[in-house]
Amino acid sequence: TMIDNLMKQSGSFRENEVVDERLMDSGELEKERGITILAKPASIDWQGSRINIIDTPGHRDFAAEVERVLSMADGALLLIDSAEGVMPQTKFVLAKALKQGLKPIVVINKLDKADQRANEVLDETFDLFVSLDANEEQLDFPVLYASGRSGWADKEVDGPRENLHPLLDLIMEHVKPAELDKTKPFAMLSTLLYADSFLGRSLVGRISQGTAKANQPIKAINLKGEKVDEGKLTKIFRYEGTKKVPIEIGEAGD
């Protein structure tokens, strides 16, 4: 629901467009249980920039999925329930993010709960960072208090509770885009391979350098640098909102 409202408030949808709730939970089990099982990408346009978002599972049963997602990220939002506080899955995901060198933004969420204890939860969160050997930069994490369902975020517990713009602004300020070279040969770290009934084999990932065009020959290599497959790109897509949109050229960072 947090991402749903981020998209709505950033103008990712037309005013008359009908939007389902829990956009990022597309599977039946995900919608039923309110959990994320498979990582899903989306994007938001904000103040002339594109923010790519990957909703990741939070449970250790999906460890490989979490690691693949974090390898594509420049930053992370760590959402923590203002009543339940730090959970086992919080520790698991945060440990992975810190190991990747990410500097998370902490969001104490669900502040509209009657039993919220935001200040205590923030202390618990700081203790968790310390226990996971976060460095000084990671320990100096920014904090927002929010209600994803109601669609607001503030720097203070008793803030005006108007919208999620403070969160979007903080992402722009705190998460620095990686310096990627568009002039080098094309390379992409693929995090998901699936079969599309119309397009055939499809890859989801982040272009780490160079550019990608249709009909461009490519090679797949393993972690040892050995070629394991080859072929050509037939179509290039980019996420706009939650929809895949065809583009002529994919560039480093897409």
Region locations from a protein language model:
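Structural and coupling elements of P-loop NTPases
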Residues: 1-254
